[in-house]
């Protein structure tokens, strides 16, 4: 007996893509004329990016370079909290810790399920921890749900994984 088609909605970042974007941004920062002699760098930790530069203006330029490289690599910028405060670091440098969103919280999963229910399609959305599983009889209904989620203006990044059909 065949199982109904389904997929999961998650908010997970592809680490290799992020590392590639950061290394490309660092390469550009090291070769750009306006960054010569500056101590600008980007580090990746488990749940955040640490951006360091000599002043706030250069830090904003580092953010611009990084976001450009991430957009080119297909990384959703909504997965990052670039609104965090700039703090003084060692010496004459400033630092910004950018939080990386990993997984959906309860409020975000509720937003997704209510959006799916408002579509009035023959699909079921169930919350499974930090993801939402969508099951339906027809693949066309699932594709409509995916299109609705892509078009929705959420303040977080939603990805689709675990396709079964």
From Swiss-Prot:
Superkingdom to which the source organism belongs: Bacteria
Keyword Nucleotide-binding: yes
Keywords from the UniProt entry: Nucleotide-binding
Keyword Zinc-finger annotated: no
GO cellular component: cytosol
InterPro entries referenced in this protein's UniProt entry, alphabetically: DUF520, UPF0234-like_C, UPF0234_N, YajQ-like_sf
GO MF terms, alphabetically ordered: nucleotide binding
Segments traversing the membrane: none
Entry's family note: Belongs to the YajQ family.
Function: Nucleotide-binding protein.
Protein name: Nucleotide-binding protein LEPBI_I1392
Naturally occurring in which organism (per UniProt): Leptospira biflexa serovar Patoc (strain Patoc 1 / ATCC 23582 / Paris)
Lineage: Bacteria, Pseudomonadati, Spirochaetota, Spirochaetia, Leptospirales
């Amino acid at each position: 007996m065949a199982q109904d088609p389904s997929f999961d909605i998650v908010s997970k970042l592809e680490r290799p893509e992020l590392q590639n974007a950061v290394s490309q941004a660092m390469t550009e920062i090291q070769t750009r004329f306006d960054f010569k002699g500056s101590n600008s760098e980007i580090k990746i930790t488990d749940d955040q990016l640490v951006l360091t530069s000599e002043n706030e203006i250069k830090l904003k330029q580092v953010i611009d370079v990084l976001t450009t490289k991430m957009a080119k690599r297909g990384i959703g910028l909504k997965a990052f909290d670039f609104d965090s405060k700039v703090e003084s670091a060692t010496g004459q440098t400033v630092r910004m810790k950018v939080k990386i969103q990993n997984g959906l919280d309860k409020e975000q999963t509720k937003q997704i399920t209510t959006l799916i229910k408002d579509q009035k399609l023959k699909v079921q959305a169930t919350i499974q921890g930090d993801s939402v599983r969508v099951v339906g009889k027809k693949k066309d209904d699932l594709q409509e749900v995916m299109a609705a989620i892509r078009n929705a203006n959420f303040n977080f990044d939603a990805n689709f994984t675990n396709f079964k059909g």
